Amino acid sequence: MAAASCFHALSTPARSSSSSLQSSSSRLPAPIKPNQLIIRSQKREETATNDAAISRRLALTVLIGAAAVGTKVSPADAAYGEAANVFGKQKSTEFSQYTGPGFKLSVPAKWNPSKEVEYPGQVLRYEDNFDTTSNLAVMVTPTDKKAITDYGAPEEFLSKVDYLLGKQAYFGKTASEGGFEQDAVATANILEVATPTVDGKQYYFLSVLTRTADGDEGGKHQLISATVSDGKLYICKAQAGDKRWFKGARKYVEGSTSFISVA
């Protein structure tokens, strides 16, 4: 978190000499009367008192300024007792590292391993304890491609692995409404595409929102990361329902697909 530091500009009041000598080459100084001595003595005492007060105020200001500069204030401290993790690295308590055959992956710490096999070549599946709609899977299949770009653009690649998004189960006649084409009860929209290169290896990343006519969960956010290495196609897919996506599941889905690395 960015720390707020306070800086105090200290200014020392300028002091001017209160006494000036008046002399004359032709006259001697006039004798000082007793009442004049008393007045001058009082002025000197007042000046000393003021100087002491100023010194104390300056000392206090210096101490406060030093404390402010030396203390880093975190906005989340008062409310939560710890710094907020905005735009920071993932906390170790939120993700655990999984090492599989030829790949490494960050898995949400609160998700459990699942034995359900949903896709060809699936070697791993984890799902949310409370909602199995939120899950991730890793698939490793043989390929004759040398690089992920050999599949064409990311959109072309997605069309070749569209089984990852689920198949339409109903093929009856339907009207064109609710954003669905005629006779279609499912739709998929690509929200984001990226082609990052990590350690000299190119990846495809796609964010897809799928919806079905039954309105289940308001749709599903499905994130796919894929690359090719040593004659194998590696795909990591993670998803969450639209409602849970905006209630905290997003960081787990994005974290899983963003931090997969293939040897």
UniProtKB/Swiss-Prot annotation:
Give the keywords, sorted: Chloroplast, Membrane, Photosynthesis, Photosystem II, Plastid, Thylakoid, Transit peptide
Pfam families membership: PsbP (PF01789)
GO terms for cellular component: chloroplast thylakoid membrane; extrinsic component of membrane; photosystem II oxygen evolving complex
Induction is noted as:
Down-regulated in response to mixed metal ion contamination (cadmium, copper, lead and zinc), but not in response to zinc ion contamination.
Q: Which InterPro entries match?
A: Mog1/PsbP_a/b/a-sand (IPR016123), PsbP_C (IPR002683)
Report the transit peptide positions. Answer: 1-78
Low complexity composition bias: which ranges? 14-30
- Report the main location listed first in the record: plastid
User: Could you tell me which Gene3D superfamilies the record lists for this protein?
Assistant: Mog1/PsbP, alpha/beta/alpha sandwich
Q: What GO molecular function terms would the record report? A: calcium ion binding
Where is it localised?
Plastid, Chloroplast thylakoid membrane
Q: Name one GO biological process term.
A: photosynthesis
Q: Name the segments for region: Disordered.
A: 14-34
Per the record's keyword annotation, is Chloroplast included, yes or no?
Answer: yes
Q: What does this protein do?
A: May be involved in the regulation of photosystem II.
The entry assigns this protein to a family as follows: Belongs to the PsbP family.
User: PANTHER family recorded for this chain?
Assistant: OXYGEN-EVOLVING ENHANCER PROTEIN 2-1, CHLOROPLASTIC, PTHR31407
Descriptive protein name? Oxygen-evolving enhancer protein 2, chloroplastic
The UniProt gene name for this protein comes to PSBP
